[in-house]
Amino acid sequence: MDVSQLTDAELRDSLKSHGVSVGPIVATTRKLYEKKLIKLSDGSINNQSNLNDSQFNEDSLIISSSPKKSPPQRVFQNVSAATAAATTSPESDSDDCEESMRYLTEEEMAADRASARQAQSNKGGFLGSTITFTILFVFIAVFAYFLIENAEQLKLVAETNPEDTI
């Protein structure tokens, strides 16, 4: 069997039939998946779970009782292919890392364009924004004028009554 001639979907299906969890097949991952399939079809890997991720079981931690200080040995239990297949559904979009989409009909595109035009016409245009900006500028200018006038009066009051300070 020539693995390089398989399409991405055929490669994915054949790997899934061997119990291998398959991610997206792109140019960078295709050769890796082809090698896995060749090893599986040749029978050089008898245990399929070596290709899948292993799951660490905390109960199976073994600590060596030797006098030298060596790091503890960890025992990993492999997840069976049936358990791995049961946790992911083959029909979900996340298996292929693709999102579903559909083409819009002409009526839907026309309705979308009409709502975009409606939203833009409700903005008020250039004249409305100019009037709003002018009113805001006048309000800020009047506020600044009264602030400066009152600051001068407060300064004069503070200078005439020096005995009020402690």
UniProtKB/Swiss-Prot annotation:
Keywords: Cell cycle, Membrane, Nucleus, Transmembrane, Transmembrane helix. Residues 62-99 are annotated as: Disordered. Residues 149-166 are perinuclear space. GO terms for biological process: chromosome segregation; mitotic cytokinesis; nuclear envelope organization; response to X-ray. The chain crosses the membrane at residues 128-148. It comes from the Eukaryota. GO terms for molecular function: lamin binding. GO terms for cellular component: nuclear envelope; nuclear inner membrane. It is found in: Nucleus inner membrane; Nucleus envelope. Disulfide bonds: none annotated. It is a single-pass membrane protein. Disruption phenotype: Mild increase in embryonic lethality of progeny of X-ray-irradiated adults. Slightly more spherical nuclei. Simultaneous knockout of emr-1 and lem-2 leads to embryonic lethality, 8.5% shorter animals in larval stage L2, abnormal gonads and a developmental stop at late L2/early L3. Missing cell divisions in the postembryonic mesodermal lineage and failure to produce any of the differentiated M lineage cells. Defects in the organization of chromatin, nuclear intermediate filaments, and nuclear pore complexes (NPCs), and defects in mitosis in cells that continue to divide after embryogenesis. Residues 1-127 are nuclear. Residues 1-44 form the LEM domain. Ubiquitous. Expressed in all cells, except in cells undergoing spermatogenesis. High expression in hypodermis, neurons, pharyngeal muscle, body wall muscle and gonadal sheath. Interacts with lmn-1 and baf-1. Nuclear lamina-associated inner nuclear membrane protein that is involved in cell division, nuclear structure organization, maintenance of nuclear envelope integrity and nuclear envelope reformation after mitosis. Involved in chromosome segregation and cell division, probably via its interaction with the nuclear intermediate filament protein lmn-1, the main component of nuclear lamina. Required to organize the distribution of lmn-1, nuclear pore complexes (NPCs) and chromatin in mitotically active cells. This is Emerin homolog 1. It comes from Caenorhabditis elegans.
